[in-house]
A protein has these predicted regions:
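Positively charged n-region of N-terminal signal peptides that target proteins for export
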Residues: 1-5
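Hydrophobic core
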Residues: 10, 14-18
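Sec-dependent signal peptide cleavage junction
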Residues: 18-33
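C-terminal edge strands of extracellular/lumenal beta-sandwich accessory domains
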Residues: 29-47, 66, 85, 93-103, ...
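Asp/Glu-rich intrinsically disordered low-complexity tracts
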Residues: 46, 62, 73, 100-105, ...
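Non-catalytic, beta-strand-enriched accessory regions in extracellular/secretory proteins
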Residues: 51-75, 117-121, 133, 178-202, ...
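Surface-exposed beta-strand/loop patches in noncatalytic accessory domains
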Residues: 55-56, 83-117, 139, 152, ...
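A short beta-strand element within beta-rich, extracytoplasmic domains
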Residues: 75-84, 202-211, 329
């Protein structure tokens, strides 16, 4: 069994201010340790949530496993460092979440020797107490006995998606007037957020991203859950070359209405790129109430008042109902 040399981190917390809700990074100092073989989930090397860890793959069949358990919700950033070489060989780095007896793949990244010496992997929207694994294996043979370094950084915050949030039942809860950061970790990843309206009014949604001259991007779909059905309200394609702040069609919300925002791929080049989803709520009785696409579900229109609406898609219809009141005699 080969020896494993890596650098572990003794974490020391630096609190930035005392404001509730501010993300608090955790900083650390380095300590060197020797660890025996870590070629399975059961023998995975335990990593602190902040640190720098170096190792090598001893042969073409060698695999290295690492395990992390965050002590709070937040963002787990992972960087993979190596020395440049003029070769297409390298490493395959896979991240997993252990949940309900299964190892759920979050991301799978191939890093070649000729790639940048510091590669940022898709971040993990981590949950307190959950177990996460990093698996490193060879991508062809030239990376054998070449040192790599895994660096992890953890930011405590409630404003990050919580993987796995790829279904309605596991959606990340998004409070009113809040901002969340997420990323699509792989080609099949889906991120779903749930919003419960605190009253009648307008839920304005913006999708923010970093500009790139690229036609790939994200597909953002908004649903209302009512009567056991998920009713599509809008469906938008946002390319990386679109405006960095993209205004989605707003939701004409009803009190205690349940709404979902679903984010999927539009082609694949945006894998691992961060996006920001922001909602702003304006309570008011003078916005349409979706779904109001039939006579039966028409929004009541009060005489003498100004009401606002929007057509969220090519198929959207808005119905308004006016009830004539008899004059007093």
């Amino acid at each position: 069994m080969k020896k494993k040399l890596y650098s572990a981190i003794l974490a020391s917390i630096m609190v930035i201010g005392s404001i509730c809700g501010v993300a608090i990074p955790v900083y650390a100092k380095e300590e060197t340790k020797i660890i025996d073989g870590n070629d399975s989930y059961d023998t995975a090397t335990y990593l602190d949530i902040n640190g720098s860890y170096s190792d090598v793959l001893a042969d073409s069949d060698d695999v290295d496993f690492y395990k992390l358990t965050p002590d709070s919700n937040g963002k787990l950033s992972i960087h993979f460092g190596h020395t440049y070489g003029d070769s297409s060989d390298g490493w395959e780095v896979i991240t997993y979440k252990y949940q309900d007896g299964e190892y759920l793949e979050l991301s799978d990244t191939v890093i070649q020797l000729k790639d940048n010496e510091n590669i940022e992997l898709p971040f993990v929207g981590a949950q307190q107490g959950c177990k996460y694994y990093i698996k490193v294996k060879g991508y062809y043979g030239d990376a054998v006995n070449k040192k790599y370094t895994i660096k992890t950084t953890f930011t405590r915050s409630e404003q990050y998606e919580k993987e796995e949030n790829n279904s309605y039942s596991s959606a990340t809860e998004m409070g009113m007037n809040s901002t969340y950061t997420g990323t699509l970790n792989n080609k099949s990843d889906v991120d779903i957020y749930r919003i419960i309206s605190s009253g009648d009014g307008k839920i304005a949604l913006t999708f923010e991203h970093t500009y790139a001259e690229d036609s790939s991007g994200w597909n953002v779909i908004i649903y209302r859950y009512a009567n056991g059905e998920y009713q599509e309200l809008s469906n938008e394609i946002i390319e990386q070359k679109d405006s960095e702040v993209y205004q989605l069609p707003y939701i004409g919300a009803v009190s205690n209405g349940v709404y979902y925002v679903k984010i999927t791929h539009y082609y694949w080049e945006e894998i691992g790129k961060e996006y920001v989803l922001r909602n702003t709520f304006l309570q008011s009785g003078y916005y349409e109430k979706e779904e109001n696409d039939s006579y039966k579900t028409a929004t009541d229109l009060m005489v003498g008042k100004v009401h606002n609406g929007t057509l969220n898609s090519n198929n959207d219809k808005d119905f308004w109902k006016i009830t004539r009141r008899r004059p007093h005699t």
